[in-house]
Amino acid sequence: MRKFFFLLAVLVAFPVHAQTGFDSWLAAFRQEAAAQGISQATLDAALTGIAPAERVIDLDRRQPEFLQTFADYLGRRVTESRVSRGQTLLQEQALLLDALEQAYGIPRSVLVAFWGLETNYGATLGSHNIPASLATLAFDGRRSGFFRSQLLDALRIIDAGHVSAANMKGSWAGAMGHMQFMPSTFRAYAVDGDGDGRIDVWQSLPDAMNSAAHYLQRAGWHAHEPVALEVRLPEGFDWRQARVSHRLPVEKWTALGVTTADAMALPTVAGRSAIVLPQGWQGPAFMVFDNFDVVMQWNRSVNYALAVAQLAHQVAGGSALVARAGEAGEAGALSTLQLKTMQQALNEMGLDAGTVDGILGPRTQTAIRVYQALHQLPVDGYPAPSVLAQVEQTHAAAAASGKLTLAPAPTFAE
């Protein structure tokens, strides 16, 4: 019911706002774009007759009711059907994928995994008009500078003849094509893979795949090295060491008793690696390598990077997780409101969880780690329901005593 009234308010108020402000904003933007060299023909084709899209604003402002556990995230993305389809495409597109691996050093299975996660192998490219969506977001104000820049780049792509304004479709946030490139990413990394003089990431798979491989190579991909692998941690493992920022050579982890999930020796990999626990100390554990950081440049989500690694592993013939994510750890997820409650309580106890926004960012994770260290809990930074219950209990007791600030504790960085 609350959602209904919110949407009703948007539908009633937004057109008034649009009529009074959007047209003048768009006129000023057109002048700016023309001054930057965008042709009048492109401006007319892309911007004439557009209006703010209420659906785009709704999607941009929406916050999920519940956080998504790693088990849920992986279960929705690394499915049997997606693995099977990926294996089929690995064979069907062997010539293209082999050529890309040779040229860029990106494994075939990794490119297929990105393709599967971004658009389900081209099945869901998005149907939003990109110029209209970006203009809506640039006008709305929350991240206007970013989307204004993206809109200018989208117009430059049209102006260069890569796609028509009518055919520039994608996600509500402006991501385009098989690999969901933002316009700025397109202009920086997109490649004409089929040699026809245009870069068509919507219809040309060689263009889309070459562009993705080029991006990953430029982001620092390490050939012949993994993104992540599932590991088994020894009894008595110091959970404080399980965080992305804590990097050790693989041989150091071996000396600490870490093995692969099936109890085999860890692979020999150059560089330093970290242990991450996406669902807390009771869930699956992963060792992540330099290529994990490369994937995080594509999408700043630990769960996304692990899903890329796991889908690539299974598409290449590897097994599913040994420690099944859905059966390990605390199955429940906090609601956004519950996480806000935890953040507020941690802040009031002097542990600096950052803005009370219901988003599990690095500052919130660090504050949880500090709290866990103070209370002799496994220090994993994970907002499990049991941790929330203890935080609320501690906060209530401290508030009743008039001494909310907790004693100093070790510092952690995610």
Predicted regions and their residues:
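Intrinsically disordered, low-complexity polar regions and short flexible loop motifs
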Residues: A33
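Catalytic glycan-binding domains that act on GlcNAc-containing polysaccharides
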Residues: I38-A270, G283-F286, V295-T336, G358, ...
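Low-complexity, glycine/alanine/valine/leucine- and proline-rich hydrophobic stretches
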Residues: D290-N291
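Positively charged n-region of N-terminal signal peptides that target proteins for export
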Residues: M1-F4
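Proline-rich, low-complexity linker regions of envelope-associated factors in Gram-negative bacteria
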Residues: Q19, G318-G332, Y382, S386, ...
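Cleaved targeting-peptide boundary
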Residues: A18-L26
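Short acidic, glycine/serine/threonine-rich helix-capping segments at coil-helix boundaries
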Residues: G332-L339, N347-V391
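N-terminal signal peptide c-region/cleavage motif recognized by signal peptidases
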Residues: A13-P15
